[in-house]
Each structure stands twice: as C-alpha cells, then as structure tokens.
Amino acid sequence: MIAYFKSLPDGYFPVDGCVLLVREAWQRFLHLENLPKHMDQFVTPDYAHELIDGYQGQLIEPIQKPEHLCMVAASGKGKWHCGVFSAEQMPGYVIHTLGCTVKIEPLNQFRRRFDTVEFYRHATHCRVSTSDTKG
C-alpha cells in the first residue's frame, strides 16, 4: 500500500483531498464499492464530526487503536484532516495529503500537529483472528 501511494504523481488528489485518499485506499485494498465521494475543501471540525456521526454503524465504526487500513481522523486549531493507517512497516504510518501531494509519516509525527486523533475502520471490515477459533 505504501508503495502504491508513493508512486502517485503530485496532483493526483486535489488540494484537501484527504477523504478521497481514504476512499481510494478502501476501494483498492479492501475491495469496497459504492463508497460516498466527498471533496469538500477546508472542512471544519464540526462539519467533519457531523459527517462521521452520520456514517457510524453503517459505513464506519470507531476503534481504540489503529489497525491496518483504518481511517485516521484528526482535528485541532480549527482544522480537520484525515488519512489512512498502514501497518506494513514499523512504527506504523499515516498516508495523507498535504496540498496536492501524498505524504507518508509516522503516526506519532502526525499526531503532534493535532489536538485529537481518532481511528475508524470500515463497519463491515473486521480483523481476522485465528487464535480463538475452534476447528
């Protein structure tokens, strides 16, 4: 996943196209179809939280810790931003947009710029665990 997003040219996503990046990651790597398409630029934290609240239980569900391919939503200082989490490499990276450029940075570095960071997975996407299955 990291290699795919690194290969994209500058301008692939529009300015403030972070939600489109998450949408593309979920379509490409979780094979999801019919995801909503949002391109609102300069989304306020309040408006973003309204959208997230409206999608909870149907499209997304909050999780306490980041999982591979979860959406990372962050807000602070009147800004809202999002990206997708990759656990392909340690310590775990957030893939997001900065202007029209794809940016990949460690989660801890991403967190420092925001007051609140939350994690959401696709509501029908659950981690597969074989440790507690009985054959």
What are these regions (language model features)?
Residues M1-E61, K65, A73-S75, K79-W80, ...:
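N-terminal capping segments
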Residues K65-P66, M90:
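Residue-level preference for short coil/turn positions at secondary-structure junctions
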Residues G78-G135:
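Aromatic- and glycine-rich peptidoglycan recognition patches
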